[in-house]
Amino acid sequence: MKKGSLAIVLGSLLASGAFYTALADGMPMKQQHNNMGESVDLHFHYPIKGKQEPKNGHLVVLIDPKIEANKVIPENYQKEFEKSLVLQLSNVLERKGYSVSQFKDVSEIPQDIKEKALLVLRMDGNMAILKDIVGENDATNEEKVIDMSSGYLNLNFVEPSSEDIVHSFGVDVSKIKAVIERVELRRTNSGGFVPKTFVHRIKETDHDRAIKKIMNQAYHKVMVHITKELSKKHMERYEKVSSEMKKRK
């Protein structure tokens, strides 16, 4: 072998050894950084499609959501989640030509509003995030520790005066996962060129990042279901049922 070729080969081997040594020593290599994950912000926004419809003369009342959350979810995250849901739900209805009023509770709706309103929309349910759930995958020799959601949200369309339910549906927000720790790297280097297995553990201990990722996905899932239920075809059916209920009073 020529001297130039030998130098290139030895240089490549030394570079590989330096790379694996860097992993073992915990240096901030690019691959490690990517596995740790980038920062995550709360993003409670869903793109609302469709043109602005003319006013249809109907009033819809929104009741502030009542979502119970476990202690893992910060209260300000929960409040922001609920606030964004009401705001975007109001935007969807207004774009479809409805007027919208908002109250904290059904009991606060004045009698004249009850008589005038077509529907009352109220949302309740629960949401929790479970921490440090361990799962193994023997096929890939990888162990993962995850945070995972649990919960179910309900949306009820109610006739204002009688409070009879016109329509209801639920959204399952459970089993949304975010990985916080994994065993994923193997190297073969024992100081020379004799292979030896070494497992390298990369850990992401930022539960706050995982909570944000899970809640962002849950919000998107809820809004997808809500926009489907508020389609023109569905709303016309709710209007018909609610009007018939008012006549039977």
Language-model-detected regions and their locations in the chain:
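Bacterial N-terminal signal peptides that target proteins for export
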Residues: 1-9
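Short beta-strand and adjacent turn/loop elements
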Residues: 60-72, 122-128, 132, 136, ...
